[in-house]
Amino acid sequence: MTEAKPVRVAVVYGGRSSEHSVSCISAGAIMEHLDPEKYEVVPIGITREGTWTQGNRAGLNIVDGRLPEVELHDELALSLNPATRGRIHNVTRHEHYTEVDVIVPVLHGPYGEDGTVQGLFELSGIPYVGAGVLASAVGMDKEFTKKLLVAEGLPVAPQEVLTGEATLDDLQKERLGLPVFVKPARGGSSIGVSKVSAWEDLEAALTLAYESDDKVLIEPEISGAEVEVGVLERPDGSLQASVPAKILGTTESEEGFYDFDAKYIDEGVSAAIPAPLSEELTAELRQRAIEAFRALGASGLSRVDFFVSDYSYCINEVNTFPGFTPISMYPQVFAAVGVGYAELLDTLIQTALARS
């Protein structure tokens, strides 16, 4: 009996977004944990300028506070012809490079998590992990995510939306109160996010947010705990919600919130997994996370972030491809229900293949 060949998995990482380095860190962890008996890994990097290039498995972690970055080698291109799906061409050398069976797009932020690269994969006919074009695009835009969730009857955090470098008027300020959080509408990893405790600091916060996006959200601070729930789709289409994780705080965050350095550099974030919530509330949050996943039409995976107080809760964000670094919440909350990192990846890849 002939042994089955390992599935060839292209792990695509880097990209043009401000979350380039986070993507590299996630990809390094993913490649390290893929079962070599089941999967043959083909690393593909995307430079900050957007060139697809030969990747590598080493050097994708933080060293002495320095963030990893994709270096340009030979340029690569994915075939867009479904008849030759999975074929990758070496543009620099004008020759065939390799073929792959499935793609894991470990791309956070614009040009990766927003439906653009998913459209490329749809054109090529290649199976890929994660949400499709529409769910990725909606999930990337926090304004439209909330509009969709509200239409489905799900509770969301209030917000004001600004575009074109506009600022808040007095009525909006009165509605929001202080403090507020200012964030790019289509960003992640807390990049470009500021906490504003005095209105005279608003313009500086808006300037920072507008550097990342031409649409900005202003949200009031909501008293209560930050609670995160992961959702995993299995090959048969069934959905599993993780236990909730409660963010306990950061040890060194000068910004006063769960910021980029706390998430990826300082390792200053601690979490209670499972969150110390009642059985009833835990079950309700897990169900709401699944409902949010379905409302977006997501696939494969998501992480749903809640604000939870003593008497109520609301959804803050839905992330259609959450961070996969070794200290990211998504792998941790599933480890707490017995789904280890390697099994998590195996499930995601098999789900992508079953969907194709």
UniProtKB/Swiss-Prot annotation:
Q: Which cofactor does it need?
A: Mg(2+); Mn(2+)
Binding-site residues, Mg(2+) 2: 317, 319
Taking every annotated instance into account, which residue ranges of this chain make up the domain ATP-grasp? 146-350
What processes does the entry annotate via GO biological process terms? cell wall organization; peptidoglycan biosynthetic process; regulation of cell shape
Q: Where does ATP bind?
A: 173-228
Principal localization reads: cytoplasm
Protein name, please?
Answer: D-alanine--D-alanine ligase
| Listed GO MF terms | ATP binding; D-alanine-D-alanine ligase activity; metal ion binding
Q: Which domain of life is it from?
A: Bacteria
Gene Ontology, cellular component aspect: cytosol
Instruction: Write down the InterPro entries for this protein, in alphabetical order.
Output: ATP-grasp, ATP_grasp_subdomain_1, D-Ala_lig_Van_CS, D_ala_D_ala, Dala_Dala_lig_C, Dala_Dala_lig_N, PreATP-grasp_dom_sf
Question: Where can this protein be found?
Answer: Cytoplasm
UniProt cofactor note: Binds 2 magnesium or manganese ions per subunit.
**Family classification:** Belongs to the D-alanine--D-alanine ligase family.
Show the HAMAP family listed in the entry.
Answer: Dala_Dala_lig
**Record EC number:** 6.3.2.4
Check the record and name the Pfam families matching this protein: Dala_Dala_lig_C, Dala_Dala_lig_N
Q: Where does Mg(2+) 1 bind?
A: 305, 317
Look up keyword Nucleus and say if it applies: no
Protein's organism: Corynebacterium aurimucosum (strain ATCC 700975 / DSM 44827 / CIP 107346 / CN-1) (Corynebacterium nigricans)
Q: Which UniProt keywords apply?
A: ATP-binding, Cell shape, Cell wall biogenesis/degradation, Cytoplasm, Ligase, Magnesium, Manganese, Metal-binding, Nucleotide-binding, Peptidoglycan synthesis
